[in-house]
Amino acid sequence: TLEQIPVLTTTWAAWKEAHPDTEVMSTEGGPETDMFERYYANDRNGIHSLNPSDKRLHGKDVVLGLDLKGEAKAYSYTALIEQPLVEETLGRQPIIVLHERSSATAVAFSRIVHGRTLSFKGKSKNPHRRSAEVTASGEGERPNYEPWLIEDTQTGSTWRAVSGECIEGELKGSRLEMLPGMTGFWYAWSRFYPAADLFGTLAESPE
């Protein structure tokens, strides 16, 4: 089995805010249009249009999937938008799953810091991302990115939700351990993990 490593699917603005010293290897290349736009919009599941065997979500509902010590669970992005901070235990490990709405970023961390299990609550606003921002052509100015901040209830320290970095308080300089997860479509995740638990329910189909 290949070792899983943590990866993050996010926006450039959110990444740059969390990692301002990032080196960009190239700004050239890339198509002017999204070649997968039609695929995202239609009901086809994969190249061969696989029918999801697990009907708890629509095939193309996006999930963050975790597999910790043999215990697997998927977190529906739709459900996380409504409840963007989830604390629980998975694989006998206390974890937190966060969804920053403005950057459409879902990420999971261990809640153990320096041998102590922390609990968290939101500190700053976590506004929904407006559709105009998602589909902007790049012309004109976009609203400034504001990172979502959370606070641990044990020390009152302030943390960035996307990077897991503590930026203020007793634990300043500490960083939550990011857990290996996979962001993908439900039809793909559920085929590899057919018995996995799910955070979220089937959304109403658009009329």
Question: What label would you give each PLM region?
Answer:
Residues 1-207:
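Mid-to-C-terminal functional-domain signal that highlights helix-capping/loop sites
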